[in-house]
Design a protein with these regions (language model features):
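A ligand-binding cleft/hinge motif common to bilobed small-molecule-binding domains
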Residues: 24-37, 157, 173-184, 228-232, ...
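Periplasmic-binding protein-like
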Residues: 25-57, 80-90, 115-116, 192-200, ...
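Alpha-to-beta junction loops
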Residues: 26, 145-147, 163-173, 215-216, ...
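Acidic, polar ligand-binding/catalytic clefts
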Residues: 27-36, 45, 138, 142, ...
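Short helix-initiation/N-cap motifs at beta->coil->alpha
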Residues: 39, 134, 149-162, 204, ...
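Extracytoplasmic small-molecule ligand-binding "clamshell" domains
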Residues: 55, 63, 71, 75-76, ...
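Flexible hinge/capping segments at coil-to-helix
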Residues: 200-217, 232-241
Length: 298
C-alpha cells in the first residue's frame, strides 16, 4: 500500500510540474497595483553637471510638450513587440521620428548607463541597445556635439555608476525619481509616468500589493518593485501621502507579513520563467515592460 501511495504522489508531482512548465505568457495578466501611486521617470545625471542636466531637460521638456515623447514610446513599444514575435504585431513605421543619429567626428563622450531588459525604454535590437531612453540621450549628444557610449549594467548599480564616473554620465533606464536616488544623482524633468502592476495567473489575478501577503514575489533587483515590497515587509510598511475625495492629505500604509518571500532577479525575463514554472506566484514591475513581456508569443 505504501508503494502504491508513493507512486501516486510521484505521479501527482510530475503532473503538477508538467502543468506549470506548460504555461504560456497568455496564461498571465498584468493588473494595476491599485494601492500604489503612479511613478515618475527621469534621466539620472551626475551631480553638479549643470550643463549636461540642462541639455537633457531641453530635449525632455520639448518632446513632452510637442507630443514626441509619446510618439517615441508608442513606436518603440510596437517595435519591441514586433521583434519579439508578439501575436499580431507588425513592423511599425517611424514616420518623421529620428531613429538614428549622426555624431559626426565628435570625440567627447557621454556615458549612458542602462539595463537593456526594459522595453520600450531600452532593449536589444540587432545587437545594439535602442529604445526611448537611448533616443533621448542620442539627441542630447547631438545637441552638445558629443557622442554616446552605452554601458549595459545591472539596474541596481546604475546610480552608483553615474556617481562614480569621472566624465559626463547619465543613468537612462526607465528610472523612477526617488529621494534615496537623489542622494547620489540629479534627475531631469519627468519624461514618463507609470504605474506598477502585479503579473500573476489569469485565474488568480492580483491587483494590490497587500494581496501579495504570504506569496512568493519576484522583482528586479533595485527597482521600485523591490524597494516597495521590501518596505511593505517592515514594521513601518511602505508609506506615501495622497489626497482623499475631499482634497485632504492622508497617509497610506501598505504592508505585507514576514511570511512573504521575495526573489530578486537581474532581468525580468528570468522572473517570468520562474513564474511560468510555479517557483514564484507573482511579479511586481512597471506596466509597459510587463505588457510588452506578456505580448510575446510562446
Amino acid at each position: 500500500m505504501k508503494k502504491i501511495i508513493s507512486v501516486i504522489l510521484v505521479l501527482l508531482m510530475l503532473a503538477t510540474l508538467m502543468t506549470a512548465c506548460g504555461k504560456k505568457n497568455s496564461d498571465f495578466v498584468a493588473e494595476d497595483a491599485t494601492d500604489l501611486l503612479q511613478e515618475d521617470f527621469g534621466i539620472a545625471v551626475k551631480k553638479g553637471n549643470d550643463e549636461l542636466l540642462a541639455a537633457v531637460n531641453k530635449v525632455v521638456d520639448a518632446w513632452v510638450k510637442d507630443g514626441k515623447m509619446t510618439e517615441y514610446v508608442d513606436y518603440y513599444t510596437a517595435l519591441a513587440d514586433f521583434e519579439a514575435g508578439a501575436d499580431g504585431a507588425t513592423e511599425p513605421d517611424a514616420g518623421e521620428l529620428a531613429t538614428t543619429w549622426d555624431f559626426g567626428s565628435a570625440t567627447e563622450v557621454i556615458t549612458v548607463y542602462t539595463e537593456s531588459g526594459f522595453a520600450p525604454f531600452e532593449f536589444i535590437s540587432n545587437g545594439e541597445v535602442i529604445g526611448v531612453d537611448i533616443a533621448i540621450m542620442s539627441q542630447v549628444a547631438v545637441d552638445m556635439g558629443k557622442k554616446l557610449e552605452i554601458k549595459d549594467v545591472a539596474f541596481d548599480t546604475i546610480p552608483t555608476c553615474v556617481e562614480q564616473d569621472a566624465g559626463d554620465a547619465v543613468g537612462a533606464a526607465g528610472m523612477t525619481i526617488t529621494d534615496e536616488r537623489k542622494e547620489k544623482v540629479d534627475f531631469s524633468s519627468i519624461y514618463y509616468s507609470s504605474t506598477l502592476v502585479v503579473v500573476s495567473a489569469k485565474d488568480k489575478a492580483i491587483s494590490t500589493v497587500k494581496d501579495l501577503d504570504g506569496l512568493k514575489v519576484a522583482v528586479q533587483e533595485g527597482t521600485s518593485g523591490d524597494l516597495i515590497i521590501s518596505a511593505a515587509m517592515t514594521d513601518d510598511g511602505h508609506k506615501y501621502v495622497t489626497e482623499n475625495d475631499d482634497g485632504e492629505e492622508v497617509e497610506v500604509v501598505v504592508k505585507v507579513s514576514g511570511d512573504t518571500q521575495v526573489s530578486r532577479y537581474k532581468q525580468y525575463a528570468l522572473a517570468l520563467e520562474d513564474l511560468k514554472s510555479g517557483r514564484v506566484d507573482a511579479i511586481l514591475m512597471d506596466k509597459l515592460p510587463a505588457l510588452t513581456m506578456l505580448a510575446v508569443a510562446d
